[in-house]
Amino acid sequence: MKWRLLRTGHKSGAWNMAVDEAIMVHVAKKAVPPTFRLYGWAPPALSLGRLQSFERDINPDGCRRLGVDVVRRPTGGRAVLHDNEVTYSFIISEDDPMLPSDLRDSFYLATEGIVKGLAFLGIEAEIRGRQGGGGSLADAYRSELRTRPGADGSVQSGACFDSPSWYEVVAADKKLVGSAQARLSGVFLQHGSILITMDTDKMCQVLKFEDPADRDRAQAQLLDKATSIEAILRRAVSFREVEEAVIAGVREHIKPIELVEGELLPEELSCAEDLMSQKYAADSWTKRR
């Protein structure tokens, strides 16, 4: 059995999301095998969860000032600032015998290879379960919470990396990889961010807060709850180094399945172009909530 590996480089947020959905369309048609893709973002982009409120959570003036695009994902969860990171996506048919029916078990299938890849970099990471978490896709979509002071004085922001999920990839007791899932037309998608560096100030400038004090508290929470590869290793790390390590980890995890490097089909590229222009680059999608 063979799965496809794609390395598609640094592209715009609208293009990246369009490609993920285009691959889903063609996996549904059985035109392509299960696909593991690695990519980056140029320019940096803020991605919203599918059901997240643009008006409530996003600061468009801050995004424009910092040169940050805004795009809405097909997956749930909260906002992620995609800048210096390696992003992965894993796409497989729901009827594939390799895909568990349980949502949390499917997270493990898609993520354990990344944990192994981090080990090749010298990072001891683990998948840590959240107690009491539900297993339905609706539960994932309920994670978009209004920015407000919590009972303990904390701030619940629109940021992914200050919020819990059922299973998190953590290192040094902090969240290192943020992921989200979707199921569409019989196809499973999981994509996520592997942070090389983390700019909490920039993240908090592109999100909306009621006052500066809330922004300061949210930034402190991000520093407390999230980390990055360079923060752990205390050295400069390149996109390519992380990419190669993750590929090695995924290959080890899925043995005896072979991960074969390939390219997007012309039909996938055409589909992605249509999805980008009609959906992911359109305000009707990005600002629909």
Give, region by region, the residue ranges found by the protein language model:
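Surface-exposed acidic/polar loop and edge beta-strand patches at domain peripheries
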Residues: 46-61, 71, 79, 85-92, ...
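Active-site loop/lid in soluble adenylation, ligation, and acyl-transfer enzymes
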Residues: 1-57, 61-65, 69-73, 142, ...
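Short connector loops at helix/strand junctions that flank enzyme active sites
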Residues: 41-43, 65, 81-85, 164, ...
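Short glycine/serine/threonine-biased micro-segments
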Residues: 47, 65, 74-75, 81-82, ...
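N-terminal catalytic or cofactor-binding beta/alpha core of small enzyme domains
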Residues: 29-30, 73-74, 92, 101-103, ...
